[in-house]
């Protein structure tokens, strides 16, 4: 039996472990992507009244370095802040007044602290088993990709991580954008998609 040349084995291994390119992923039927996988188009900073202060269309990085666009991945790095407040929220420039389903995948470094803002209220998105508050999750995968699904109906959000309930009935205002928080350490988000419901 002939053995494969070592370069062929290495090439296969590299191909298998390469991260997916931005164009390899598409939203599920009926969903619209909120992150284009290339830059921060459609995202920006808002003030406390949620008025848009700054937008990052066509830019690979936020003005304070807290958020950056990598192929397929939106990186949140609290340690990159060169200026501005300790806490930051990156918001969609679009608002969502209707019922919807939001799907988002995240990967946290150890003890990372971020959050997903739903119109205004925050759903904690962290390295849950270390940073809490949902330390009893059994399907959470530390330092790996996890999926959050938020279903909003009549201004109430049902939130799950890998099929386990995080919040059963989180009350929301009637309209608002989607936001991602930079608080502690690094968090990565990908496959951010939303589908409006009747």
Model-derived features: where do they sit?
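Carbohydrate-interacting regions of secretory-pathway proteins
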Residues: 20-198
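Positively charged n-region of N-terminal signal peptides that target proteins for export
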Residues: 1-5
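Bacterial N-terminal signal peptides
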Residues: 7-15
């Amino acid at each position: 039996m002939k053995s494969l040349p070592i370069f062929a084995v290495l090439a296969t291994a590299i191909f298998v472990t390469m991260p997916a390119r931005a164009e390899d992923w598409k939203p599920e039927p009926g969903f619209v992507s909120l992150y284009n996988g290339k830059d921060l188009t459609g995202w920006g900073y808002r003030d406390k009244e949620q008025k848009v202060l700054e937008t990052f269309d066509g830019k690979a990085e936020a003005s304070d370095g807290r958020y950056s666009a990598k192929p397929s991945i939106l990186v949140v790095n609290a340690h990159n802040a060169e200026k501005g407040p300790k806490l930051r929220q990156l918001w969609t420039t679009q608002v969502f007044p209707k019922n919807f389903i939001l799907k988002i995948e995240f990967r946290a470094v150890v003890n990372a602290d971020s959050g997903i803002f739903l119109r205004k209220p925050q759903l904690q998105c962290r390295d849950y088993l270390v940073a809490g508050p949902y330390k009893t999750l059994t399907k959470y995968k530390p330092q790996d990709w996890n999926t959050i699904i938020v279903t909003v109906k009549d201004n109430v959000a049902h939130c799950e991580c890998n099929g386990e309930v995080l919040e059963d009935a989180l009350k929301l205002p009637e309209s608002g954008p989607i936001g991602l928080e930079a608080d502690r350490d690094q968090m990565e988000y990908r496959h951010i998609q939303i589908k409006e419901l009747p």
